[in-house]
């Protein structure tokens, strides 16, 4: 399947299919040099898939640390210096092969190298179906996640579904959080549909039918980011579950999607408090338990520490913490939330696990 962005200009294709990786070769000839920045774990399993591409004299492979460990100033400088040592021109391509962190990191390299070179995303995880589309790239700071970055569109997104076959279950769980988030944004019917399809751990682990939901997720994100590329309005909705989730992820060092799922439950609690919504918190907690999400760490949440991370969230303004909240399905808002409400919601979340 081929999707296409519909911006007024500078559009790019998104290939979502088995065997999509073959499309890379059609781009290589266009560039003076190409650098494949590949996640160390992906390289272990799939190095042979890039043998043909690496046979080109102008194509280089750079193995980078897996996951968030790569999104540091140190790794950024080391990688940039290596690429610059090849006397690159602006007609250079950075090709990101890996999960969301790899795409974030490689995209920031592409955005800043010579003030911008070509960038191709080759996502290899379910999680990256979200991050590879929309043009957000960046690295982390000691103050929080993704605080240093840019909006930078790729030249193409090449999503070969073959990569998903070797994902460990932890990564399936992490990626599913973003797929589920897109369903929540699409409303009650879409949420019920995905919950009925992926109703337990066994079905989720099989990935049966995941292709369809990944494609739906990409289409959902495309509709939003094309309407609001620079996150001035509706694009903020894509941060559902992320205000609290990022804080939990950064402090407790758990996978991104696991933390986002905790953040989704948390925002339901906040919405119930602020709007007298009637979200069934037990339903969502039980659903996550059925899927196999490890939630024991919720009892160890320390609000004061997490709140300091929430204060650094990119959605905030001078008035304080802003959260994306589902008031009712189909009625999503970006709302300022006071510290006391946030604290009470954290305390209430913990009561479900005592």
Swiss-Prot record:
Cofactor annotation comment: Binds 1 divalent metal cation per subunit. Can use either Co(2+) or Zn(2+).
Required cofactor(s): Co(2+); Zn(2+); NAD(+)
Amino-acid biosynthesis keyword on record: yes
Residues binding Zn(2+), per UniProt: 178, 242, 256
Family annotation (InterPro entries): Dehydroquinate_synthase (IPR050071), DHQ_synth_AroB (IPR016037), DHQ_synth_fam (IPR030963), DHQS/DOIS_N (IPR030960), DHQS_C (IPR056179)
Keywords recorded for this protein, A-Z: Amino-acid biosynthesis, Aromatic amino acid biosynthesis, Cobalt, Cytoplasm, Lyase, Metal-binding, NAD, Nucleotide-binding, Zinc
E.C. no: 4.2.3.4
Molecular functions (GO terms): 3-dehydroquinate synthase activity; metal ion binding; nucleotide binding
Pfam families in alphabetical order: DHQ_synthase, DHQS_C
GO biological process terms held by the UniProt record: amino acid biosynthetic process; aromatic amino acid family biosynthetic process; chorismate biosynthetic process
Domain of life: Bacteria
Compartments where located: Cytoplasm
EC class name: lyase
UniProt catalytic activity: 7-phospho-2-dehydro-3-deoxy-D-arabino-heptonate = 3-dehydroquinate + phosphate
Residue numbers binding NAD(+): 100-104, 124-125, 136, 145, 163-166
Pathway: Metabolic intermediate biosynthesis; chorismate biosynthesis; chorismate from D-erythrose 4-phosphate and phosphoenolpyruvate: step 2/7
GO cellular component: cytoplasm
HAMAP family, alphabetized: DHQ_synthase
NCBIfam families found in the cross-reference section: aroB
Family, similarity comment: Belongs to the sugar phosphate cyclases superfamily. Dehydroquinate synthase family.
Function, as annotated: Catalyzes the conversion of 3-deoxy-D-arabino-heptulosonate 7-phosphate (DAHP) to dehydroquinate (DHQ).
Listed name of the protein: 3-dehydroquinate synthase
Organism whose genome encodes this protein: Staphylococcus aureus (strain NCTC 8325 / PS 47)
Lineage, highest ranks first: Bacteria, Bacillati, Bacillota, Bacilli, Bacillales
């Amino acid at each position: 399947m081929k999707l296409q962005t519909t911006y007024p200009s500078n559009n790019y294709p998104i290939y979502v299919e088995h065997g999509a990786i073959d499309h890379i070769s059609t781009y290589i000839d266009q560039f003076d040099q190409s650098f494949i920045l590949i996640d160390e774990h992906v390289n272990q399993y799939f190095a042979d898939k890039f043998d043909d591409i690496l046979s080109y004299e102008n194509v280089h492979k750079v193995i980078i640390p897996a996951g968030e460990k790569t999104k540091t100033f140190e790794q950024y400088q080391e990688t940039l210096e290596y690429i610059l040592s090849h006397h690159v021109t602006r007609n250079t391509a950075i090709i990101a092969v890996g999960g969301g962190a790899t795409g974030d990191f490689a995209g920031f390299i592409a955005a800043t190298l010579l003030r911008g070179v070509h960038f191709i995303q080759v996502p290899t995880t379910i999680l990256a179906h979200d991050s590879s589309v929309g043009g957000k790239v960046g690295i982390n700071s000691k103050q929080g996640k993704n605080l240093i970055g840019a909006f930078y569109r790729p030249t193409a997104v090449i999503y070969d579904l073959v990569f998903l076959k070797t994902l460990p279950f932890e990564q399936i769980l992490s990626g599913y959080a973003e797929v589920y988030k897109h369903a929540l944004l699409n409303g009650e019917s879409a949420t019920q549909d995905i919950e009925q399809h992926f109703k337990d751990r066994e079905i989720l682990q099989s990935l049966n039918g995941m292709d369809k939901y990944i494609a739906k997720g990409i289409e959902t994100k495309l509709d939003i980011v094309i309407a609001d590329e620079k996150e001035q309005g509706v694009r903020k909705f894509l941060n559902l579950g992320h205000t609290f989730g990022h804080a939990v992820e950064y402090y407790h060092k758990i996978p991104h999607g696991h933390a986002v799922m905790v953040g989704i439950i948390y925002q339901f609690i906040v919405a119930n408090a602020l709007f007298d919504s009637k979200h069934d918190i037990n339903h969502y907690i039980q659903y996550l338990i059925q899927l196999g999400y490890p939630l024991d760490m919720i009892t160890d949440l320390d609000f004061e520490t997490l709140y300091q991370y929430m204060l650094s969230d990119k959605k905030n303004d001078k008035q304080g913490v802003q959260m994306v909240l589902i008031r009712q399905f189909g009625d999503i808002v970006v709302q300022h939330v006071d510290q006391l409400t946030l604290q009470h919601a954290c305390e209430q979340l913990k009561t479900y696990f005592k």
